[in-house]
Amino acid sequence: FSILLFDEIEKAHPSILDKFLQILEDGRMTDGQGNTVYFSETIIIFTSNLGIYTRGADGTREANVTSDMPYQEMSVRVREAIENYFKLDLGRPEILNRIGENIVVFDYIRPEVAVRILKSQVDKIIRNLQSEKRITVSLSDAAYQTLEEKALANLSNGGRGIGNIVENFLINPLARYLFDHEIFGDATLKIDEIQADALPPELKCS
């Protein structure tokens, strides 16, 4: 068995879709030299950002779905946009017919999930410092709350956005603090405060 992943399929040239149509319809593809590849034991995944944005009356890009929208409403809007793209924009409804109902609309990261992702990333940093540098790090409630507020401020960038928050407000300032204070191992450190408004962000530790 094998898995094929085609990322952001809407960016492919329309002629490429003819190849996919052959695969989805016949389960095989033959090249110009008569070589045939069979896909009977292959899972094919297409990813797409279709439906996230739409064109406004003035032609500018507008958000079609938002992170505060209920999942059911968001799913309906995305599916409608995908259908319109294949039927109206491309004029290729047969491709959509081959895909059928096998469309999974991923939800935005909701606040309760974002908190879990944040905790997982922070815990990993603490474990790595302990195991690799023998540096024991903990965060005060206030410091952790600062991270949480930053992570929840804008969830439109998903897990990557949360990772950027952790990097900008914890990893980088912590690395600077350890270097400036010549802490290279066998130490215990408590982060009392994250000064998020400083440029760059700084830590107060004890």
Q: Where are the model-predicted features located?
A:
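AAA+ P-loop NTPase nucleotide-binding core of proteostasis motors
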Residues: 1-206
